[in-house]
Structures are given as structure tokens and as C-alpha cells.
Amino acid sequence: MRGIEGPSFPILTRRDPDVTAPTAINLRSDTQTLPTERMRQAMAEAPLGDDTYGEDPTVLRFEAIAAERLGTEAAMLVLSGTMANLIALLVHCRPADELFVDAGAHVVYYESGGLGAVAGVTPTVVASDRGHILPDALQAAIRRPNIHYPRARLVWLENTHNRGAGSVMHMDHQRAVEAVAREHGLAVHLDGARVLNAAAAQGLDVRELLDGVDSAMVDLTKGLSCPLGALLVGSSAFIEQARFRRRLVGGGMRQAGVIAACGIVAFEDLLDRTLDDHRSAHRLADGLASIDGFEIDPASVETNMVYVDVGALGRSTDVAAALKAAGVIVSDRPPRQIRLVTHLQITDEMIEGALGRMAEVAASLRATPAV
């Protein structure tokens, strides 16, 4: 067979023994969570059927539970948050329609260009504060209808914001953005991969953050510890259209109850423990602030993400590699930052262990002049 010509891409999914070693403290992401024992049992015992025919009882039960708990008319299980976001684009927009979005939004930065390659939308970047688009900037970006312009269609929010260091879009800010969108007849989608963190940080029920949007994605693989899956939620009419788009992009599933079973357990056991992860992140930030070479303002940590400036120690890629060799796995954010994320399976002992190892690495790097 002939090969496909074009650029090569690094393999990111190859098993790395340094990451999976029992002694490693993996703070790379909250996607590193593993299914709980109750999830594993639920997967084994779940009643199953063919979800493509709407006959998997566990999927049907989970979607009903999720819609009720999240305060929406309907919910649909999909394979990933990226797929849920893509489906939302396909339902809300037609090719060339205009999407108003922050430059660092996950859908722009980390979803392989699907918004252009598959959905064919026209992104218009709107000024933001820590990733959250500003209402006045959105107002200024929306143009009067004209044959020279794409059709304005969708406003995209992300809460919490990944590249905004896990920052929270507070309720009054979100409502102001929603009001501008409504004024111009635009739909609003919320990338709520970590919306449970956003709600917990504000002392709100998650329903309040989903109440003013037309659709939202909620990821199951982060703080909720599921092995895969996400929810797309919205009105019954929206989800009816979304089921067709899910099939279109290859997301139709058969005995998907094994995924839904984990989601049911997550909703029963884990929805109310999110603040534990935030407290762990604050302990981590406080400890790092006292180590020479790690620059961080602990007050900047709003949820479970800790972004640290390591420029004083060298390039972030080199610092991340040194930490990995010491058994602390972090995410590299070149050229100066690393990211650490707390989650269900990061214990207090792990936080203390990570701080000790990181202090040793910092001391070693300070003693070794950069080449």
C-alpha cells in the first residue's frame, strides 16, 4: 500500500514506563485518573443493549440522570469532550458561519483543527481576561449583517479555562456575555470540561452555570475519574440533532453501557468532592512558592490547576524532563511554564512527596549553570 504523504506527528500515546511507574507522582492532568473500584464493578455488571438503536438501558438511565442533575432537558453520551464540542459546532453552525471565541480556547488550541477541517466555521478571536471573553469586546466584534461577512452564529465559552490556568468565569461575567449574545440572536455553547470545578469554586450548583447557555459539554474523564466519555447537554431538539451529527462523525456506539455505568457511579459518588482537589492545588502552590526557582502567586490558583514559571531554572522542557527523572510528572508549557493538576487520586502524601522531589530538582538545576 502507498503511504500517505505529508507532515509527520509525534506519537503521544506510546506507553512511557517513567510515567506509569508505581513510584511516579503523576500531576500531568486530571485525565490521569483511573476508574474507581465501584466503577469497575459497575462496568462488569451493567445491563447492555445496542445504543445505536436506543436500546442500551444503562446509557438511557445515565443520560436521564445527567440531564436531571445538570438541569437540562436532555443529555447525550459521547466518546470524548473533543467529539462533543465538534458535534455542538455541527449542530449550531453551517460552513462559513462565524464563531466568537478566545484565542486560547481548547477548541482552537487542542482539538486538531476540527472546527475548520470538519465544521468549517470561521473563528473570530475576541479579547479575553485569562481566557474569558470580555462582554464589551464581544459587542465590538459582532458586525451588522452584510454579504461581505460570515453569518454570526455562535459564542464559545470555556469554564474553567485550561490555558487560563484553570481560571473561573464568574457568574456575573458569564451572564454579561450571554446578554450580548442574546441581543444579537447568537447561540452560546459552554465547553464545560471542568465546569464542576467552576461551580464548586463559586459555591454554586452546576445547574446555575448551565442555565443560560444553549448547549454544554461536561467531561467524564477528569475529576469524575471515568476511563472515557463526555456528555453533551441541551434542549431536547438540540440533542435530537446532535444524535445525527454524532453518527456523522463516527461516534455511534453499540454496548455503550460499560461507559455509562462509570458515569452513573461518578454522579453518585464524586460530584460533591471537587473542592478537595482545589485544596490540594492550594497546598501544592503554597509549597512551590517557598522553593527558589519556582515562581507562582498562590492567589492565582482558583481551582485544581497550578501553573508555575520555571524560567529561573531553565527552559520549561528541560525542567519538566528533570522532574520526570525524579518521579514527578508535569505538563510542559513552553517556554517558561509547567502545569500541575490535582485530582481524586492525588493524596496529601503525594503532594508532600512531590514538593520534596521538586525542591531537590530545583536545587540541582540552580547548581548547574545553563548551557
Pin down the residues of each PLM region.
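Residue-identity detector for glycine
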Residues: 3-6
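Conserved PLP-enzyme active-site core in the AAT-like
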Residues: 12-14, 18-311, 316-326, 331-346, ...
